[in-house]
Amino acid sequence: NCTFRPPIYNRREGDAIKSVQIDHVLVGPEGVFLIETKNWSVDSLNNLDLRSPVAQIRRTSYALFKMLSGGVVNSDIALRSHHWGDRKIPVRNIIVFINQKPREEFQYVKVLTLKELRNYVAYFKPVFSKEETQMIGNYLLGLNA
């Protein structure tokens, strides 16, 4: 759980984010992967009373983006410079379904089964050095301390 005082405000969604619960964050040379896991049945997938995992991960992703941006601005995360400008930390949103997954695809969110996860992450080319990867990971671990 991450709590924010003052809340992080997402203007686009009109949402004051006071806290988020993050299932998993994978930090690797390929970027940062925000992973929400769901062990849902077919009935759960069709249940309109359950909160949308897509909305949930997009909300959490915005908070994670703001945390990482703060680390770069405050020089807690020092990425190798590039003569074109500031480099970004890609955050990729993944919902992993253990049992059933929906057939639909969603904007800014990849929906996978557990078996598909490894190949999806391996698909991306490295954008960070070993040192940068370690720095990002240490920064995120320090936020939770």
Name each region found by the language model.
Residues 17, 26-42:
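Active-site beta-strand-loop-beta-strand hairpin of nuclease catalytic cores
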Residues 1-20, 41-47, 51, 55-145:
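Surface-exposed interaction regions that form or flank ligand-binding interfaces
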